[in-house]
Structures are given as structure tokens and as C-alpha cells.
Amino acid sequence: MMASNVTNKTDPRSMNSRVFIGNLNTLVVKKTDVEAIFSKYGKIVGCSVHKGFAFVQFSNERTARTAVAGEDGRMIAGQVLDINLAAEPKANRSKTGVKRSAADMYGSSFDLEYDFPRDYYDSYSATRVPAPPPLARAVVPSKRQRVSGNASRRGKSGFNSKSGQRGGSSKSSRLKGDDLQAIKKELSQIKQRVDSLLENLERIERDQSKQDTKLDDDQSSVSLKKEETGVKLIEETGDSAEEGDLLDDDEQGEDTLEEIKDGDKETEEGEDEGDSANEEDS
């Protein structure tokens, strides 16, 4: 069961049993985490978490003091807690101390949390703590004046921020225009380079095609020349063969003529011999 959010009761009994937790990383630590940490000391009547600090309302003062003694200086979520009783702020600490009071650390939001007359709080804290009351009175008005001053500054800064935003938007639009012009220029340069590369490639292709056609023509001419030389060789060999045959035929004819002549001579000689023999017989 979750505790109540009410931690601003003005009766002294509630004040003595209320614990202030300062330097709290409220971005990480939630109300349930605070209740889980402090519930081990006793019953929690109320718990409220604000930006940077929190309050825990216990049922009695003894439990609250035990919780302060047990958790003061503990590190949670990367920050060292500054814990004290809400009725006993640490205004009496030395100026060189590490920890500060809640009013110094958190400004007017801490003071507004109590929601009771400032004179009563000052008198009560003066009776409980030996710290001089004028310090507490001097701190609070200065903080409140700073808040009002901050509000006026916020108004001025808001106007200035609007004008600054307008100026920034005009500068950004101008920068965007310059960037666009630069990009456009680079793109045009890239396009020119690509076009020149394409022209070079086309020229190379044309030259290569011309070389290929020339090689084809040379090869075809070489093949034609080879064919012509082959035909010539064949014709020459045929002519030489025919000439050889003719020569052979001529030689054979001459041989036959000589044989015929020799045969005629032999027949003539035989006739002469026969005639001479006949003459002798007669």
C-alpha cells in the first residue's frame, strides 16, 4: 500500500517526524523507491517526491531520527543524499562543509513545501537549533527576490529567444541555400566528367571496331593470297607434269623410229643377200 502524498502538515509533531531528502536524482529514483528505502525504519505516513528532493513523513520522531542517521550521506543513483529532519535544517553547519541546507540547495520551492507562516518556522527552528535566526530570514527573501528576477529575465529571454530563433532560422535557410548551390555545382561537375568518360569510351569502341575490321580485311587478303599461290603452284605442277609426259612421248617416238629404221635396214640387207645367192646359183 502506497503512502499518502501529504507531507506539509504544520503541527509540531508532524514537523519532528518529517525527513527531508536532498540531492536526490529524481530522474531515476521514484516515489516507490524512496518508500522502499525508508520503510525499513518504520511506518511511513506520507511521501512526496519533487524535482531534486523529497519528503518522508514518519509516524513518530524517533523513527525519523533513526532514518536520518542511517541514510544521511548514502549514495543513490550516482548522488550523495543530504538528509536531515525537516524541522532541523542544517543551517548551523560550517561554510566549508560539503552539505548545504535545503533552502540553499533548492531555493523557494523547498520553503513553499511547508505551507505555514515563516515566523512560526523561524521561531521553532531557533528553539530547536542553536543557529542564529537572522541567517534563515536573510536567506529566504533573497531567494524569493531572485525568483521574481528570474521571472522578469525569463520574459526578456523569451523574447530574445524568439528573435534568436528567427535569426537562426534565416541563417539556417541561408546555409541550406548555399549548401544546395554547392551540391548543384558538384553534381554538374560530376555530370560533365561522366559525359567525357562516355565520349572516351565511345571513341575507344569505334577505334577498336575499326581495328577489328582492318584485321579481318588483312586476314581475308592473306587467305586469298594463300589460295592464289596454292592455285598457281597446282597449275605449275600440272604444267610440269604435262611437259614431262610430252617429253617421254617424244623419246618413245624417237625410239620407235630408230627401231623401224633398223628393221628396214635389216630387211634390205636380207634382200641383198638373197639376190646375191640367186645370182650365184644361176
Swiss-Prot record:
UniProt-recorded Gene Ontology molecular function terms: N6-methyladenosine-containing RNA reader activity; RNA binding
Keywords: Coiled coil, Nucleus, Ribonucleoprotein, RNA-binding
Compartment list: Nucleus
Coiled coil: 177-217
Presence of the UniProt keyword Nucleus in the record: yes
Broad class of where this protein is predominantly found: nucleus
Disulfide bonds: none
Residue ranges of the region described as Disordered: 131-177, 208-282
Segments forming domain RRM: 17-88
Compositionally biased region (Low complexity): 161-172
Gene3D superfamilies: 3.30.70.330
UniProt short sequence motif Nuclear localization signal, positions renumbered to this chain: 141-147
Basic and acidic residues composition bias: residue spans: 208-217, 224-235
Family per record: Belongs to the RRM HNRPC family. RALY subfamily.
Function as written in the Swiss-Prot or TrEMBL entry: Binds pre-mRNA and nucleates the assembly of 40S hnRNP particles. Interacts with poly-U tracts in the 3'-UTR or 5'-UTR of mRNA and modulates the stability and the level of translation of bound mRNA molecules. Single HNRNPC tetramers bind 230-240 nucleotides. Trimers of HNRNPC tetramers bind 700 nucleotides. May play a role in the early steps of spliceosome assembly and pre-mRNA splicing.
Name used for this protein in its record: Heterogeneous nuclear ribonucleoprotein C
Lineage of the organism: Eukaryota, Metazoa, Chordata, Craniata, Vertebrata
Chain's gene name: hnrnpc
